[in-house]
Regions:
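Short hydrophobic/aromatic patch on the recognition helix
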Residues: 43-52
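DNA major-groove recognition helix of helix-turn-helix
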Residues: 53, 64
Length: 160
């Protein structure tokens, strides 16, 4: 995760580095992505990069988690619009994702995740899931899901 030094940077400086990283990770597979290209495009010294993130994986993890958070916000809005009906919300979420193609690779945008998955075939098989904390997602969804619309036998059946 980013250091406090990074979080204290001016937003435009953060955006510059993150935009360069998004471009790098969406244009190349993770194992070919280069910190040198990222810092060159962002216009920062390589040493500064290491003051902000431990390594390439740390930056990649941050980008993926930020993108997932953005998608959760969208899903929460869809769920609320569907009165907490998960099964009615899923097709809407699918439509949302299809309407935001991989070309929409802005920071945290759904296209970013799509492009990263497409560039990293090995990650599709669950590698990205290691960056996700399911219990936090479930906690966040708790207020949005209407349990009365589900066939729950125990409160724990929802996962929290």
């Amino acid at each position: 995760m980013p250091s406090s030094t990074f979080l204290n940077l001016a937003p435009e400086k953060q955006e510059k580095l993150l935009s360069a990283a998004v471009r790098e990770f969406t244009e190349r597979p993770y194992n070919e992505a280069s910190i040198n290209r990222i810092v060159r495009e962002a216009g920062i010294p390589r040493g500064s990069f290491y003051m902000y993130f431990r390594d390439k994986e740390d930056l990649f993890r941050y980008l993926v988690q930020e993108s997932i958070q953005e998608l959760l916000v969208v899903f929460e809005e869809i769920l609320r619009g569907r009165n907490g009906d998960v099964f009615a919300a899923l097709p809407d979420m699918y439509d949302y994702l299809r309407s935001h193609p991989a070309a929409d690779c802005g920071l945290g945008g759904p296209g970013m995740m799509s492009a990263i998955v497409n560039r990293n075939g090995g990650l599709q098989k669950g590698g990205l899931l290691e960056f996700v904390e399911p219990e936090l997602i479930l906690e966040r969804m708790e207020d949005c899901v209407n349990p009365d619309l589900l066939d729950l036998r125990e409160p724990e059946d929802l996962g929290y």
